[in-house]
Amino acid sequence: EKDYSNVVFAGDIELMECINLADAFITDSPSTPLMKLVATRLPILLYVDRKHYLLVSRAKELLERRCAVFAEDPDSFMLGFDRFLESHVKDGVPISGDVDDRFLYEFGLGDGNNPAKNIVNLMLEQIKC
């Protein structure tokens, strides 16, 4: 058995109530809270069960770059979790690093390409009013 005494799991509380109190986040799905988490500078440990979620390859690629741990099976997640604790905590204090924001821009904020606006502009060009 491993000793995870330095890990505290929050109960069932609203994410925004604890987002500024955490040193890192563990989540198990690519759902709405993930978009809030990628907007922070904090490490994210993400477990995406392949049996329940199918990510497009670009989302998977960007999440692998953004997350401190990205895994699609329990064993890989626990291995990544152990490595994270060894490398991101020094003398009981979390160590933060740079984060890759491409997932946030491409899947959250958009990269400047607005499909709805594009189709409206195309239609306006074609229908000369």
Provide a role label for each language-model segment:
Residues 15, 74-75, 116:
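Residues at or immediately preceding the N-termini of alpha-helices
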Residues 1-4, 24, 29-110:
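Catalytic binding pocket for nucleotide-activated donors in carbohydrate/polymer assembly enzymes
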Residues 5-12:
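Active-site donor-binding acidic/aromatic loop of nucleotide-activated sugar
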